[in-house]
Amino acid sequence: MAGHSKWANTKHRKSAQDIKKSKIFTKITRKITISCLKNGTDVNKNFQLRRILEKANLYNLKKDLIQKAINRGKDKNKNIQKKSFNMKYAGYGPSGIVIIIFCNTDNSNRTISNIRNIFSKFKGKLVKYNDIKYLFNFFYYININNIVNNKEIVLSIIKKNNIKNFKQIDKNNMEIIIKLNKFKKIKKIFLSSSIVFTNVNLVIKPKNIYIINNIYKSKIKNMINLLKKLKETTKIIHNTKI
């Protein structure tokens, strides 16, 4: 009986691990497809895709699954993009922390229902995104390709526009960081010099970190983990340390 119990426990544990791994694989392949739709399939130009593929390799995601996800994101399959759209939701969690959830969904009613249920479970409440965004700073992380041929022009624009946050990633790529309210102006200046942004990522950081009591930490962790497990979730931002 003891041997049977041990075998049953091992089987149950393996089954739970397989389910967890399957959810991770689903989320990674979804991110690959979305990244390809937004920024193309060339990893030399799409640095977001490169990072996702590195993560896929860490989890030993099969190459055929990766390729299928990439194929879904190619230009010939843009009908996928029409079926789904990006949404963002916000709310207050335990101890009053603010949480922003970014989603890519093909059914906004289902998504908001799932998110609302999680907030209710932890006695939180959903609010309008515009009501809480003042609590965060918004930056664009921008990649510029082909620096070898345009380095002098790029550095000149950076200097004239007082862009202080920039770095050269390798001999052919540079990353610059621009505040949200300056993005359109800076983009226009670069375009006037025939320099195109090859990858653009919005980064959101809280203006102040909200220190929470240890009593609430486990609740907040559990809540955020449940939100992350939703297949539609692409990113979660909050204003505390856990």
Swiss-Prot record:
Subcellular location: Cytoplasm
GO CC terms: cytoplasm
Taxonomic superkingdom: Bacteria
GO molecular function: DNA binding
Keywords: Cytoplasm, DNA-binding, Transcription, Transcription regulation
Gene3D superfamilies attached to this UniProt entry: 1.10.10.200, 3.30.70.980
GO biological process: regulation of DNA-templated transcription
Residues annotated as transmembrane: none
Alphabetical list of Pfam families matching this protein: TACO1_YebC_N (PF20772), Transcrip_reg (PF01709)
Chief subcellular location: cytoplasm
Disulfide bonds: none
Family in the record: Belongs to the TACO1 family.
Protein name: Probable transcriptional regulatory protein BCc_197
